[in-house]
Amino acid sequence: MAYDEELAGRIRTLLGDRAGLTEQKMFGGLAFLIGGNMAIAASGGGRILVRVDPAESDPLVATTPAEPMEMRGRQMAGWLRVEAGAVSDDAALGEWVERGAGYAASLPPK
């Protein structure tokens, strides 16, 4: 399934002109990287994937609409999936964009 281009545009606008920001198509989505580290990705159906501090994954799953990201039946530490309905407005999407961008920016550049 192709990524949601309208959602990618919203993410792009929210990220603005941050230093080290690049985009890369991967896994059928469009990933936004900061310093070479994935921060957030637009995927199909209006869903997003967000990179967070692995220590924050469980608390975020417990208190937000996020779910653990799974790949090939295995949970990916520090990655969360957020369904379209939870990011339908820019304020909600902006919170997730900031979470992902903040964590990616805290990592050493690649």
List each model region and its residues.
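Charge-dense, helix-prone N-terminal extensions
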Residues: 1-110
